[in-house]
Amino acid sequence: MEEKLKKAKIIFVVGGPGSGKGTQCEKIVHKYGYTHLSTGDLLRAEVSSGSARGKKLSEIMEKGQLVPLETVLDMLRDAMVAKADTSKGFLIDGYPRQVQQGEEFERRIAQPTLLLYVDAGPETMQKRLLKRGETSGRVDDNEETIKKRLETYYKATEPVIAFYEKRGIVRKVNAEGSVDNVFSQVCTHLDALK
């Protein structure tokens, strides 16, 4: 099973809040048959499952602490192993947020094939998030919080992009355009992997 993961196509998907990376991931799953894994979704699913690990996670998150990297990686690996036979590849969404997370992923799971950087400017992301806030009811979609989230995102992501750029596996997608325009750029990069 470990061998299968080492041979699998693994794509880290990085993009700011409001960059549209969630939408792009959905489209990739639909067209290419990849498995979309979001660390946030995995954590939430584990907590609501009521498992021993879920209970521990719930306590950590309630205290506002960060979930240990080891736990996140265990969950990612479990999810990947479960799909290794049927999946055409894996989209790892919102990970790594730090260089160390990327290094640990490689040590414990496998090397990424590509890092897909869904890149939209801060004004675009802010506009999209404010628009989403009108309908989503998400508490973190207001102007003040959005500015903070974008700052945090840029600080965390720049070193990660730089780290993988040195290896030549970053594929940048201009996410300013329409969903379809962005997706056609994504397809160009993914088709080149075959």
UniProtKB/Swiss-Prot annotation:
PTM annotation (Phosphoserine): residues: S38
Chain spans, region NMP: 38-67
Binding-site list for ATP: G18, S19, G20, K21, G22, T23, R132, G177
One cellular component (GO) term of this entry: cytoplasm
GO aspect biological process, one term: ATP metabolic process
Binding positions for AMP per the UniProt entry: T39, R44, Q65, L66, V67, G94, Y95, P96, R97, Q101, R138, R149
One Pfam match: ADK
Primary location: cytoplasm
The protein, known as: Adenylate kinase isoenzyme 1
Native organism: Oryctolagus cuniculus
Species classification: Eukaryota, Metazoa, Chordata, Craniata, Vertebrata
